[in-house]
Design a protein with these regions (language model features):
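NAD(P)-binding Rossmann-fold cofactor-contacting core
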Residues: 92-109
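Phosphate/diphosphate ligand-binding glycine-rich loop within oxidoreductases
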Residues: 1-65
Length: 235
């Protein structure tokens, strides 16, 4: 992805950025705000594709590890466009579902949500579907850090299709090596486009950030970006 930051944009005539992606961590939003540059992303454009990836991965994992999904509990961290669809997939499999989403919990109340600590203690499957925020109230950078892995009780399988930096790679490797987790399913990697070869060799499923790649996802993202451009320029 092109990094849309001060180095690229300063002195240019750019007034609007449309990214055909869910994530926008490649856009320096603070600089854009200072420079008067508006931007938009495409939330939910490929959510069905990512949910299908999770569905397929769970079926593969179930088969390889001889698991009965309807006896397990899944923790979904981030319950937006993707996470909500993953919850439906899990429910259809008969899996007990726990949801963690701090921004939604603060808006909607605690009734439907639980803490990350409870997910760490009770879940056999933990899957991450949060945007990458490197700082601030809802920081997700290294959300799964050493403290998180040390709090795990059930040796879960860890799934990440959000952003590589949401999980501390070094700590993830340590957890795989010492048995704190049973498996990992990884589609996103720290420091992309590089892929950590040691981690790749240890995960049960490893893919190069393709969970959301589908014809429908690309078409949706393109349409959403085009609509945003037309709206901005009053076309």
């Amino acid at each position: 992805r092109t990094h849309c930051n001060q180095e690229l944009l300063e002195g240019s005539r750019v007034k609007f950025i449309a990214t055909a992606t869910i994530g926008f961590d490649h856009i320096d939003t603070e600089y854009c705000k200072r420079a008067g540059i508006e931007w938009t992303n495409a939330p939910g454009c490929n959510s069905a594709s990512v949910a299908q990836y999770i569905q397929s991965s769970l079926l593969i994992w179930k088969s390889l590890r001889n698991k009965k999904l309807d006896e397990l509990t899944i923790g979904i961290v981030g319950v937006g466009n993707v996470g909500s669809k993953v919850a439906k997939v899990a429910e259809d499999f008969g899996i007990r579902v726990l949801l963690n989403d701090l921004p939604r919990e603060e808006k909607e109340g605690k009734e439907s949500f639980t803490s990350l600590n409870k997910i760490a203690e009770e879940c056999d499957i933990i899957t991450f579907h949060v945007p990458l925020y490197k700082e601030g109230k809802y920081k997700t950078f290294h959300l799964a850090d050493e403290d998180f892995f040390n709090s795990l009780k059930r040796k879960p399988v860890i799934i990440n299709t959000s952003r590589g930096e949401v999980i501390d790679t070094g700590t993830l490797l340590k957890a795989l090596n010492n048995g704190s987790i049973s498996d990992a399913i990884i589609d996103v990697w720290e420091h992309e486009p590089e892929i950590n070869r040691e981690l790749l060799e240890k995960v049960i499923i490893g893919t190069p950030h393709i969970a959301g790649y589908s014809a429908d996802g690309k078409a949706n993202a393109t349409r959403m970006s085009l609509d945003a451009i037309c709206k901005f320029f009053h076309i």
